[in-house]
UniProtKB/Swiss-Prot annotation:
It comes from Bacillus pumilus (strain SAFR-032). This is Uracil phosphoribosyltransferase. The lineage of its organism: Bacteria, Bacillati, Bacillota, Bacilli, Bacillales. It catalyses: UMP + diphosphate = 5-phospho-alpha-D-ribose 1-diphosphate + uracil. Binds 1 Mg(2+) ion per subunit. The magnesium is bound as Mg-PRPP. GO terms for biological process: UMP salvage; uracil salvage. The gene is upp. Gene3D superfamilies: 3.40.50.2020. InterPro entries: PRibTrfase_dom (IPR000836), PRTase-like (IPR029057), Upp_B (IPR034332), UPRTase/APRTase (IPR050054), Ura_phspho_trans (IPR005765). Allosterically activated by GTP. Its EC number is 2.4.2.9. Its cofactor is Mg(2+). Catalyzes the conversion of uracil and 5-phospho-alpha-D-ribose 1-diphosphate (PRPP) to UMP and diphosphate.
Amino acid sequence: MAKVYVFDHPLIQHKLTYIRDVHTGTKEFRELVDEVATLMAFEITRDLPLEEVDVETPVQVAKSNVISGKKLGVVPILRAGLGMVDGILKLIPAAKVGHVGLYRDPKTLKPVEYYVKLPSDVEEREFIVVDPMLATGGSAVEALNSLKKRGAKNIRFMCLIAAPEGVEEMQKHHPDVDIYIAALDEKLNEKGYIIPGLGDAGDRMYGTK
């Protein structure tokens, strides 16, 4: 069963409060999402492997540690997931970036893949799939399906806010993918919005309706 990690770092929780606030404008919203993504990336990369190397300081040669050849990839779910990418790349600039685009079929209400672009060495990379919201879980499940059928084997999912229903759906379909979130909210309402949530992340990020 996939593990769920809720980050309770004070800075993450502080910034998340203003992300939720209906009075937060588009520019500030984008900046806050970027900042929280950086803080979450710091937490999610705690287990990266290290190897010891020699480094020449101005005084003498010393033993020190560097990341041990780990290949990472960041995959935002379009469009709202794009707002989290730069925050992660600030910490791991060598990561390759893929994209997964999905839309909801008006008849079946199920997510449909319309765009996928991943690094060519997909089987060798560990991916962090990002989306600000995990509501019903439908889009996240389909995005992970897209990665796996193209050869991805090591995947983590990172979002700002999740509903219990979305977490359950993810664990049902992708029990091998751990979930990293800033807050686990109460529930979904009848329209599928997370309660209390933050509204529509994409609309608030890009100033659309």
